[in-house]
Amino acid sequence: MADTKPLHQTRFEAAVSVIQSLPKNGSFQPSNEMMLKFYSFYKQATLGPCNTPRPGFWDPVGRYKWDAWNSLGDMSKEDAMIAYVDEMKKILETMPVTEKVEELLQVIGPFYEIVEDKKHGRGSGVTSELGSVLTSTPNGKAVNGKAESSDSGAESDEEQAATKEVREEDEEEESEHSEQEDKDVEQQPGHEKPAESIVNGLTRNHRELVTEEPTPLPSKCLSEPGDKVAIPDTHSPVNDPEADREEDCTEDIAAMQHLTSDSDSEIFCDSMEQFGQDEADHSLLLQDAMLNGDITETSAGGELKDGGEDGKQSGHGAQRKTWSEKSEHFGSRRERPSRMQPGGDGSRSGQIGSGGDGDRWGSDRGPNGSLNEQIAVVLMRLQEDMQNVLQRLHSLEVQTASQAQFLLRESNNQPMEKKPSRWPFGISPGTLALAVVWPFVVHWLMHVFLQKRRRKQT
């Protein structure tokens, strides 16, 4: 008959015998919660669902047992036996090895080895799934021309071929994208081709920013002896060679340095917000480079004057002051020291326009003027806010001082507190005297009443 028992019942009986054989004062003492679990599973496995009424309040232990048994609901006997054995497996390592425990281990079998096999199989499955994902992904990412992979040494020929195809596709997409951008720029009305040569330390990578200026630069600059770079003025109505030579602004190429931005080495942009931030950085670089190069441009007349004439009066000093202020501003904006070169002699420093007002350099053209106006507006608003804050602080200080004075006056105007009475009792003396005297008064009245009554009887 023992052979016909199911396996879960045999394991259940062995586990029950182990629990019943535990000594009361042994080394292993299960907790009350654990014993409640074993009790509920045992009752469910032997008697089925709980149908007995709940014990009364005088039996708290029975009530706890009944609650644990009733919480199992309609669990079947087989499930209760299996759950009982599972709970036994959790504490089997902490129990001392006895004959009953050895019998239970023989009935349960080597469950530790089965767990290890499951872990090993699960890890190999994850590895195989990861390998299949890596090999079956058609759209692999290529960052800076290098494909991402988990193990480059273990790639097969097919993976290498797929990676090569992905690289070629990405390169073709990039080239098509750049060509399409160039075509769109060329098709814009009233647009001229930007300068390809170095303009004040800016290379062709910044041609989009150069074209945003109202004065586009031609692709060809006149070169003069001494390594000079000429920047013609396109505002002049007549392209006269002599006027061009007078309007050219020469500058040493050795003094020019290539300006690099934080995003020169970044090819890919994560979002449009980053792209807009890069454009703002490039615009700041362009303005900073124009300040550092000491470039002087003509106004609508296109006339450049040397510092030997009118530059000594107002243009030279004011222009140096304005450039120093702007260079300090841009240096603080980009969190680096300004690289503006000090103004040289009169031949190197020119003035703008026929009026010779160097303070208006760039105020009516390009984003520089709007930037200065925005800065001025922000400073004015900040000053107003600071004044409001100071006024509020002053009003708070005045209110605090007035409140302190008011409290001081109130404390002075309060009458002097009465000295504590020396009477030891909590009641007044009159009340105490009345309480002591009234029994005698009542007794005297009763005595008088009784005497009158006796007289009447006699």
UniProtKB/Swiss-Prot annotation:
Database matches in SUPFAM superfamilies: Acyl-CoA binding protein
Main location: membrane
Pfam families xref list: ACBP (PF00887)
Alphabetical UniProt keywords: Autophagy, Coiled coil, Lipid-binding, Membrane, Peroxisome, Transmembrane, Transmembrane helix, Transport
One cellular component (GO) term of this entry: peroxisomal membrane
Listed transmembrane segments: 430-450
Ranges in coiled-coil conformation: 154-188, 373-402
Membrane topology category: Single-pass membrane protein
Comp. bias (Polar residues): 125-139
Role this protein plays: Acyl-CoA binding protein which acts as the peroxisome receptor for pexophagy but is dispensable for aggrephagy and nonselective autophagy. Binds medium- and long-chain acyl-CoA esters.
Protein name: Acyl-CoA-binding domain-containing protein 5
Lineage: Eukaryota, Metazoa, Chordata, Craniata, Vertebrata
